[in-house]
Amino acid sequence: MAIANKNIIFVAGLGGIGLDTSREIVKSGPKNLVILDRIDNPAAIAELKAINPKVTITFYPYDVTVSVAESTKLLKVIFDKLKTVDLLINGAGILDDYQIERTIAVNFAGTVNTTTAIMAFWDKRKGGPGGVIANICSVTGFNAIYQVPVYSASKAAALSFTNSLAKLAPITGVTAYSINPGITKTTLVHKFNSWLDVEPRVAELLLEHPTQTTLQCAQNFVKAIEANKNGAIWKLDLGRLDAIEWTKHWDSGI
């Protein structure tokens, strides 16, 4: 997918990886970039507008833990204004295994709810034009950081959901792929809580190993958007972009 002249909705587009990805997207010249985030950041929005004044950038406050009905209301406002949306990026995430319910609500249920809401506008069974979904998951969806099992499980769930979305594309007209960053230097990983304090130094230990910058991750994210491969499981780690082949151990047969 060429980003130029496209209409893009980016959930959590002002976060660590999110903000650098928004910068890279804006450089590629979309028609509209609509950022949905829990906390407004006027300085970041102004910076994005300055990068490419030809791009219309709009911000709406949004908490992914709201109901599908509330998400649908907001999306209706956006669709009424833009008429068409080409790409939805689901990027909300938290890393704090003290907050069990919120971790699941943000990292998994939020992705499901926002995706479900946009289907009202995209599903070809309802006369919709289809669309593309990029879900930010994590390499912990492949293999857990076992000291944060709640976070890791929430990302594995989001990855499984995304894989199913891709297989449903012939029915819905909506394609999907997952973006799975490795350990990236953001505020998310500088200090966080392990489950039941099983490893108080988990953040410190992780950062002793090679990482990547948010810019490296963002640049590869844009490459994945441009590749636009339905069902792709992209690993964005150590400055590289690699497609992962999923090992099948069971098949429903239907």
UniProtKB/Swiss-Prot annotation:
NAD(+) binds at residues 10-33. Substrate binds at S138. It catalyses: a primary alcohol + NAD(+) = an aldehyde + NADH + H(+); a secondary alcohol + NAD(+) = a ketone + NADH + H(+). One of its GO terms (molecular function) is alcohol dehydrogenase (NAD+) activity. GO terms for cellular component: cytoplasm. GO terms for biological process: alcohol metabolic process. Keywords: NAD, Oxidoreductase. The active site is at Y151. This is Alcohol dehydrogenase 2. It comes from Drosophila hydei. The gene is Adh2.
